[in-house]
Amino acid sequence: MTTRAKPSKLIKGATGDFEIVIGMEIHAQVTSRSKLFSGASTEFGGEPNAHVSLVDAAMPGMLPVINQECVAQAVRTGLGLEAQINLRSVFDRKNYFYPDLPQGYQISQYKSPIVGEGVVAVDVSPTEQIKVGIERLHLEQDAGKSLHDQSATESLVDLNRSGVALMEIVSKPDMRSSDEARAYVTKLRTILRYIGSCDGNMEQGSLRADVNVSVRRPGEPLGTRCEIKNVNSIRFIGQAIEVEARRQIGVIEDGGVVQQETRLFDPGRGETRSMRSKEEAHDYRYFPDPDLLPLEFDQAYVDGLKAGLPELPDAKKERFIAEYGLPAYDAGVLVADKETADYYEAAVRHGGAKRDPKLVANWLTGDVAAYANSVGLSVAQTHIKPGQIASLVDLIADGTISGKIAKDVLSILIAEEKDADPKDIVEARGLRQVTDTGAIAAAVDAIIKANPDKVAQAQAKPSMLGWFVGQVMKQTGGKANPQAVNDELKAKLGI
């Protein structure tokens, strides 16, 4: 499914409007203890060449043996992408030379991938959703890593990554802006994490993006694309697209022709640079790997894996809307991270109760999320427990504390009494809100008596009521029930 560019998504050039066309190839490292064709560990961060088998090093006579878990993870991912699962696929040799590719070829899948066409629903904004088509998903080996900063006179090779299983997920050219591309990668990463087939840690190289960018006049055929290799953050993906699109528009408007090539994004300089001319499939001389039989399984195998899938983000979002009455936006924010979604449900249901789901969502997506972001964690990774949030919400709901006092209690939970029950904090520190109407009436009378000029202003301009509320709250140390204060002031001021 191809989206049609909205006028707001067109880029203005010196000679008119242009449309960006974006497709992506995502390389997702498969979550597996061992590599695709060997038993070597996939652990990240080991000493150079600590996790290398004879197969990974391409020693003569060593034959590859397929890792069944990697196959299962690819099928699970295909199911999560609503894609066609191919019951027969073939591994091919992709021939090219590079120092960190010891075999002289990469084992990949060309004509017969394990997963065919699928689709991903992507929320670009609270009011816009697009469908991005998936062209294919195939399994392949990762290469090693060349190290150029260990010696002044030579380059070294680390083969720890050599042979690690990758899923290459190829999208159709259905994206029309950097915002759409960022949202697509974010959604795809969420799906992979829910399934457990890739941890999605871009900073460790577990998820890398090759971004294909072209530009055209609206309504014209597709332009010549350039591939930006190995973009390693969602923010950089957006920047790379913007920079490359502007570069191509400049070439066209200067009367030149965009050359099909592979480019590198330099975030420091804010530019893309040419690496090499873009290879075509025939340049790699693909042919079936003679050391590996075709990969075949039956529908029962696929059905078994499908039955074991967790609830995926879209289904969870719809359930949160239906079961908890959440707005679509709140539900989308919560399900974007599986652990946060689980945390939310644990807080709502803590102690066997079912407290106000919207109030819990407000706290998790508001103050708690703000704290988590400030320390670089997700909500679920903080020390604040679901039970503590449940207790805090209960105190607000039953009128024990106001929302303002609740913020103070949360601050205490964050900085001081990290394991405390909010109820205990409220009792120990005397933070119960004042609900006694007599005490509130006395505070209101005192403020009115001290500010006769403000009384006249408020009676002429009711919006002044907020000033009086603030003064009463200040006098009561923020403990007065805000609604009771409002009601008392309106009665006394006659507004």
Curated annotation (Swiss-Prot):
Its EC number is 6.3.5.-. InterPro entries: Asn/Gln-tRNA_amidoTrfase_suB/E, Asn/Gln-tRNA_Trfase_suB/E_cat, Asn/Gln_amidotransferase, Asn/Gln_tRNA_amidoTrase-B-like, GatB, GatB_C_1, GatB_Yqey_C_2, Gln-tRNA_amidoTrfase_suB_CS. It catalyses: L-glutamyl-tRNA(Gln) + L-glutamine + ATP + H2O = L-glutaminyl-tRNA(Gln) + L-glutamate + ADP + phosphate + H(+); L-aspartyl-tRNA(Asn) + L-glutamine + ATP + H2O = L-asparaginyl-tRNA(Asn) + L-glutamate + ADP + phosphate + 2 H(+). It comes from the Bacteria. The keyword Nucleotide-binding applies. SMART domains: GatB_Yqey. The keyword Protein biosynthesis applies. GO terms for molecular function: asparaginyl-tRNA synthase (glutamine-hydrolyzing) activity; ATP binding; glutaminyl-tRNA synthase (glutamine-hydrolyzing) activity. NCBIfam families: gatB, PRK05477.1-2, PRK05477.1-4, PRK05477.1-5. Belongs to the GatB/GatE family. GatB subfamily. This is Aspartyl/glutamyl-tRNA(Asn/Gln) amidotransferase subunit B. It comes from Methylocella silvestris (strain DSM 15510 / CIP 108128 / LMG 27833 / NCIMB 13906 / BL2).
